[in-house]
């Protein structure tokens, strides 16, 4: 029996210990109403008596209605809460009982009792326990390193990568590599977050002489003591040895095949690359200054548009001048030469027989004072404007007031007409610039 109690206790403890905490989002009171019902009965005299009754069952129904109202609001708000807290669960907590502003009773008139219940909308708050980092996250969080490394691999996009301490690093910043690309020095090896597989070769930092081989004619001890630089024999080197030495095993051949990257090599490479780096930065951050070309092109377009407008105005002025000026010729005040209007008049006279000076011709239908300046209708005078004549609310507007209103409306029409003409002219100019 004791084991069963312990097992049950553990079963209850485990889920409760991992349960989320709940916090309140909003609290409100929700209402339901119990309306009185008419009950008819007979008194001692046999007369019908009507009473308005509210029972305890009605109060229970009103309380359930209040809880249902709270549930409806919660269902609607849950969508909003999910957008704000996507990782939380939501619940509605209501009281077991409602608060009433009355008690079951009977009255002679219709009446009601209000039932209120408190509703608390809550959300779950997960326990803030730090999760264990994955190997990728551990690698990505490591700081950048610098230095010279061996076993460098080249990526498909041309980048250089190393496998160091179980994490992959990419060469950034200034990078210098040997001809074969297996040994590189970089000012910043940054972790990529990738964890190499167990079968991939690892990289290690390289010191002066660590990557040197035996060179030509070197011995087994050539690597750690300088390889090509000190190659040759068992104790050979640039100065030669008692058994190996010489130009072949020592300086010339051994140095060219086993030399590692040194600080001086990196410094020299950076010095040589500095001019090209500066030019590349300049080309990336600057662009050709074509402001003068754009300004010149804009000025040319403006000049062409202005010339077109000026020619059109001059042509129209010459046509009107030749029509109204009897003298014409060089003494004309409106310019010398024919206009498009003159050519149209000549064409009408030559092909259609319409003469400008002919009486009864088609010209007279529009080239006369009435056609050029048509008279505006003047109406039939002015009379007072009367509304609701003969009633208490009769309204009289005299002719003087009507004249003022007419003047104001005329001025408004003049302004609108001027604005329309101005807009039309400017739109033509804009089209000319385009």
UniProtKB/Swiss-Prot annotation:
Q: Where in the cell is it found?
A: Virion; Host membrane
Which InterPro entries does the entry link to?
Attachment_G3P_N (IPR008021), Attachment_G3P_N_sf (IPR036200)
Q: Where is this region: G1 (Gly-rich linker)?
A: 89-107
Query: According to Swiss-Prot or TrEMBL, what is its membrane topology?
Result: Single-pass type I membrane protein
Its BP terms in the Gene Ontology are: adhesion receptor-mediated virion attachment to host cell; entry receptor-mediated virion attachment to host cell; viral extrusion; virion attachment to host cell pilus
Residue ranges annotated as compositionally biased, kind Acidic residues, are 127-137
Keywords in alphabetical order, please.
Capsid protein, Disulfide bond, Host membrane, Host-virus interaction, Membrane, Signal, Transmembrane, Transmembrane helix, Viral attachment to host adhesion receptor, Viral attachment to host cell, Viral attachment to host cell pilus, Viral attachment to host entry receptor, Viral extrusion, Viral penetration into host cytoplasm, Viral penetration into host cytoplasm via pilus retraction, Viral release from host cell, Virion, Virus entry into host cell
Q: Which GO terms describe its cellular component?
A: host cell membrane; membrane; viral capsid
Pfam families, sorted: G3P_pilus-bind, Phage_Coat_A
- Per the record's keyword annotation, is Signal included, yes or no? yes
* Ranges where the record places region N2: 132-200
Q: Which cysteines are joined by disulfide bonds?
A: 63-98, 139-167, 177-184
Broad class of where this protein is predominantly found: virion
The UniProt subunit note reads as follows: Interacts with G6P; this interaction is required for proper integration of G3P and G6P into the virion. Interacts with G8P. Interacts with the tip of the host pilus. Interacts (via N-terminus) with host TolA.
Q: Could you tell me what this protein does?
A: Plays essential roles both in the penetration of the viral genome into the bacterial host via pilus retraction and in the extrusion process. During the initial step of infection, G3P mediates adsorption of the phage to its primary receptor, the tip of host I-pilus. Attachment of the phage causes pilus retraction bringing the viral particle into close proximity of the host cell inner membrane. Subsequent interaction with the host entry receptor tolA induces penetration of the viral DNA into the host cytoplasm.
- Supply the domain comment: Consists of 3 domains (N1/D1, N2/D2, and CT), a glycine-rich repeats and a C-terminal transmembrane segment. The N2 domain interacts with the I pilus, whereas the N1 domain forms a complex with the C-terminal domain of tolA.
Family, similarity comment: Belongs to the inovirus G3P protein family.
Q: What protein name does the entry list?
A: Attachment protein G3P
Record organism:
Enterobacteria phage I2-2
